[in-house]
Amino acid sequence: MSGPSGRPTRAPRLGAGPLRVLQYGVHDTGYPRNVRVRAHLERQLGASVVVAPRSHAAGRLRRAIDDVRSLVRGARQADVVLLSEFRLSHAPLAWLVARLQGAALVVDGFVGQYETAVDDWRRVSPASPAALRFRVLDAAAVRCADLYLIDTEPRAAEIVRRHGPSAAVVPLAVGAPAWATRQPPAPPHDALRVLYYGGYIPLHGVDLVVDALTLIGARRRVEVVLVGDGPARRAVETRVRRAGLGDRCTFVDAVPEGELLAHIARADVVLGVFGSSAKARGVVANKVWQGLACGRTVVTQRSSALDDVRYAAGGLLVQTEPTSASSIADALVGAPLAHQAESPRDVAERLESVVQRSYDRFTDHLSALGPRREHP
């Protein structure tokens, strides 16, 4: 059996028959993270993966009861319970059910409760009881796991430092979706076309990008398209208008994922993340993978999480100094147009090899969880 990189993929050595996995807490079966994890288990490991149906009943209590029943029923036939990325608060329940059924618990910590509510969205104060509750839930998710998944080495190291878990913490790279393929450059043009897409969350640091555009001034003609919606969009629009950048910036409402490719194809540069939080300094955002896989220059802030990506992407990846608008401005002034960029023709394959190596490690750790129950 071989992965996308062409190297042999190791199957778990956990007993006879295919591995049986219950994927619990999936909020959206089309979300790229759980789609890729599920595909790896099914296509490369020959696992049987069942997604526990999510209740849509009226009333929170009714939904909770339905979800617990779904978890218990599914776990009876599972060797592994895989808790999906947006349900870390369910980790103690998933742990209890998995233990009662003799299954291992794998937790995908890709989206932490605290970092999302406190760092990303800033919905609650770090000193609030709600923030403390989120910290406790995140810690419980790590402690409950037999195997804990995250997306980058820096974030994995931080989890180990903070929680000291007995279970392995395995970075599982995000990677680019199948639709993100190399795009021919747009016909020659004069202005540098820059693309931002996302939800205007603090992680993205859009305010810093606006500051950078102000600093560029007359140094270069730059046109920016901003695709997406979010609570902060109106504030960004106001800031752009007050800075006199209205002729440089075009705001576009959110589009389906399938339409992003056309926006990327038209761009010379795709923007990554520029936020000031610890998470912003430790992630490789979806848009970074996607922009690079499409053969576009990606400008994003410097992070050790980008080390492997940097070697695969070559000159397409441009890193800026954290929290520095002037560094972003310099990067945009010096960025090549798409038809001038030195883009490795196999950049998507190189990036996929980086992802596959992380999934190979996941396979090894999954294999080490121990013998499974015999199939009935």
Annotate each language-model stretch with its function:
Residues 234-261:
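Nucleotide-activated donor-binding/catalytic signature segment of Leloir-type glycosyltransferases, i.e.
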Residues 115, 204, 258-263, 272-292, ...:
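Nucleotide-sugar-dependent
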Residues 135-182, 189, 249-252:
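Donor nucleotide-sugar binding/catalytic pocket of nucleotide-sugar-dependent glycosyltransferases
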Residues 36, 184, 322-323, 336-370:
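A charged, aromatic-enriched C-terminal amphipathic alpha-helix characteristic of glycosyltransferases
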